[in-house]
Every structure is written in C-alpha cells, then in structure tokens.
Amino acid sequence: MSLVRLLILIVLLSAASLRAESPAEQAVLAAIKSPQLTVVHLWAPWCSNCLAELKTGGWTKIVNENPQVKFYLVSIWNDGQDGRAMLNKFGITAQPNVTILADPGPRRGENKIKQLAGLPLSWIPATWIYKGGDLRYALNYGEVRFPVLQQFLTDSQSEWSHKGEPSIE
C-alpha cells in the first residue's frame, strides 16, 4: 500500500510542477497587487502587430507621459528571450517605470504558455490594466490604439471597483 501512496504523491508533485509559475509570472502577480496603476503588455519581437505598435512610437510616448504608471512588458512565446534589443531601438528600456520580462516558454507545442495571471492567452499583443489587484481593462487580440489606452489609464486612476456589488446570478 505504501508504494501506491508513493506513486500517487509523485504524480501529484509532477502535476503541480507543470503548473508552476515562471519568474516572469511571479513578478507580474506581485506587481498587479500594487495600489498603483500597472500595465501588463504581452508581446513578442517576431509578432508583426507588436512591431507595428512599437513603430508608431505609441509605447514610447505612453510610457513617457505616464511616469506614475508601472509598465511590465512581457515577451511570451519567444523561447525565454525578453526582446530587450528590440525595445531598446524604441527607447523604452531605459525608462524607470518599465520592467522587461520574458516567459521561458516556446512559441509552439505543448509547453507554450496558455494563460498568465489567471487570464487566457491566445493572441498577442495583449494589454491589461490593473489597479490594486483589480483588472480594470483587458485589450486582447490585436494592436492597441494609444489614445484609447491613454483614456483607460486616465479612467483607471479613479477609485471605482466592483468589489461589494451584488452578484448578478
């Protein structure tokens, strides 16, 4: 009987390690709990939509014009590479309110990341705005329009929250 228990324990530990959070995800999870406004941008240097966003200068401008906001640029599906060289071309890496991270996973295959911080990932770029642990906005499946992102950042400075509201169920 003890051999069966040992095998069950090994299987359970193996399953738990498969779902372990990467250092990048751990950093994001810690950051989004902050009371300050936090933007998590998921991207990859090989992604044409991500490059289009960078080439417009929108990210550089939004980072510079919002020094009170923390930006986490997380390269995903890029075999653990953070894309820092690409971001450096656009003057983003030297900004004090920017943290550059990389998920260690590959672009394809069963080890490709499918969620981050509890949210599904199926397309990049994706941009999430948090304040005090609350997801304020999620812009998924394509390029962000920077005037819209700026409006969302402005709106997110308010103190509104859905906590304490009655359930609709």
Report each predicted region and the residues it spans.
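Bacterial N-terminal signal peptides
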Residues: 5-15
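A short beta-strand-turn-helix
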Residues: 20-37, 61
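Non-globular targeting/processing and membrane-anchoring segments
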Residues: 21, 151-169
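Short active-site neighborhood of thiol/selenol oxidoreductases, capturing the structured segment around
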Residues: 32-51
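Loop/turn elements at helix/coil->beta-strand transitions in domains of secreted/extracellular proteins
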Residues: 34-39, 67-70, 94-97, 124, ...
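Solvent-exposed loop/turn segments at secondary-structure junctions
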Residues: 44-49, 76-81, 104-107, 135, ...
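Structural microenvironment flanking redox-active thiols in thiol-disulfide oxidoreductases
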Residues: 51-92, 106-112
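Thiol/disulfide oxidoreductase modules built on the thioredoxin-like
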Residues: 105-150
